[in-house]
Structures are given as C-alpha cells and as structure tokens.
C-alpha cells in the first residue's frame, strides 16, 4: 500500500498515528473484519430481538406483554447503572495494560471489576426487592411478582455488560456480542415457545423467568469462553489492585453516560 503524504503541521500528531494505523494492511484488515462481524451480529441480533418481541406479544397477550416490557426496561437500566462504568473503563484499562504488558495490573483489574460489578449489582437487586416489598401496598398487585423476578436478572445483566467489555478489549468480537445479541433473544424464543407448545400458560412472570434463564445461560457460556481465552493474563502472580483509581475513572464514564 502506498504511503500517504502527511502535512507538515500534522507531524507526530494523533492524525499521523491514525494514518499509520489505517495504512497498515494487516491492521486495516483486522479492523475491517471486526467491523463487518460486529455489523452482521448487530443486524441479526436486531432481527432476532424484534422477532422475539412479536412472538412474546402473541404468547403473553397485550396486558402481560406490557408488564414484561415495563420490567425489562427497569432491568436494562439497572443493569447499566450497577455496572458503575466498569463496562466502559474496562475497554480502556485492559487494552492499555495489554499494550504495555502490565500483566499484574491486568489480572487485578479483571478480577476486581467482575467481582465488584457482581457484588454491587446483587446488593442493588436485593435493595430493589426490599423496596418492592415495602411499597407493595402502593404498587399495583400484578406488578409485584414480575418486578421481583426481573430483579433476579439484574446481577446477570450487569455481568453480561462487563464481560462484553472484557471480550471487546481482548479483540474477541464474537465472544463479546453473540451471547447478548444472538443467544439471549434466541433462548427467549426457545424457552417461552417451548412452554406454549407443550401446553403451558405464558404470562409476564414466566416471560421474565425465561429472561433470567436466557441471561444466565448466555453469561455462563460467555464467561467460560472468556476465562479460557485469557488464562495467561488472568493467572499472573500477585495481581496488583488500584481500586481508587479504577473506581474514579469508571464513575467518570458512568456520569458521562448518564449525562448523555
């Protein structure tokens, strides 16, 4: 590939570094391949999600599907909130530590971030369940059980977000996006469709139990693949932990996302 002339004013600038990246054939091919994979997964995932919503609306009925959709929005928002920005900062920290071969910090961040996200999301879900019980006389009765079941999904949802970021940072495109965009809606169709096919009754609660099951299966599969693929950096001796710095940067990402 021919060299691109860079204006003198851009010497040693980010613009020049970007051009060097783009003009590297191997790196360009890798970037294009990843972009095509992500685009294809997102398109297929959007189609599966749309199909799953149509089928759920038919199987659950208008009233129960409305409850399911309402709780799903809450689960999604809480799953993002209880990630505390680690799903955004994870891409930065992991890529940086890999590039500079700081395996102790990399191992420390991988362990710390996933444990913190899981613990905080679990505490948040428990607090949410307590709030639902405290307000059960105010909340419409048909919302109580679906919200409690939906809250079970929050820690798993937050972990899925975190593991997606980890896989992206390691360049594992399929591992990052397939579980959340393809496997989860596909399992929803299989679980609820199987229940209806074999004579079961589908409602908002069973739909949310199916969501919990789909997210759990997706998270287990994703976690197993990631942990096997990153065995070397994960097993580095004496992980270095910089909790204050990681929290500060992660919360900055979270605040920025909330503002947007």
Protein language model features and the residues they cover:
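Short membrane-interface helical motifs at transmembrane helix boundaries
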Residues: 94, 123-141
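N-terminal membrane topogenesis motif
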Residues: 1-48, 111, 239-256
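Alpha-helical transmembrane segments of multi-pass membrane proteins
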Residues: 138-163, 212, 216, 251-253
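Small-residue-rich midsections of specific transmembrane alpha-helices
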Residues: 10, 48-52, 69-98, 117, ...
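Membrane-interface junctions at transmembrane-helix termini in multi-pass inner-membrane proteins
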Residues: 156-182
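Hydrophobic alpha-helical transmembrane segments
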Residues: 148, 178-230
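Interfacial/gating helices of multi-pass transporter permease domains
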Residues: 56-77, 144, 204-209, 242-256
């Amino acid at each position: 590939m021919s060299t691109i002339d860079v204006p003198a004013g851009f010497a040693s600038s980010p613009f020049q570094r970007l051009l060097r990246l783009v003009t590297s054939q191997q790196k360009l091919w890798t970037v294009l391949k990843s972009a095509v994979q992500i685009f294809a997964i997102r398109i297929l995932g959007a189609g599966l999600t749309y199909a799953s919503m149509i089928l759920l609306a038919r199987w659950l009925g208008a009233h129960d599907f409305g409850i399911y959709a309402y709780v799903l929005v809450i689960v999604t928002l809480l799953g993002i909130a209880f990630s505390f920005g680690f799903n955004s900062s994870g891409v930065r920290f992991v890529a940086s530590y890999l590039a500079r071969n700081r395996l102790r910090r990399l191992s420390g961040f991988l362990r710390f971030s996933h444990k913190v996200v899981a613990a905080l999301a679990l505490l948040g879900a428990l607090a949410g369940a307590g709030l639902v019980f405290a307000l059960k006389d105010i909340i419409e009765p048909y919302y109580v059980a679906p919200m409690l079941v939906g809250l079970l999904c929050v820690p798993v949802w937050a972990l899925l977000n975190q593991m997606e970021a980890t896989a992206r940072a390691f360049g594992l495109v399929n591992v990052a996006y397939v579980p959340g965009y393809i496997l989860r809606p596909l399992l929803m169709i299989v679980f609820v469709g199987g229940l209806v096919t074999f004579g079961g009754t589908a409602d908002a609660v069973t739909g949310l139990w199916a969501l919990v099951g789909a997210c759990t299966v997706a998270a287990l599969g994703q976690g197993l693949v990631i942990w096997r693929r990153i065995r070397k950096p994960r097993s580095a001796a004496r992980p270095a932990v910089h909790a204050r710095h990681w929290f500060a940067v992660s919360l900055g990402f979270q605040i920025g996302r909330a503002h947007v």
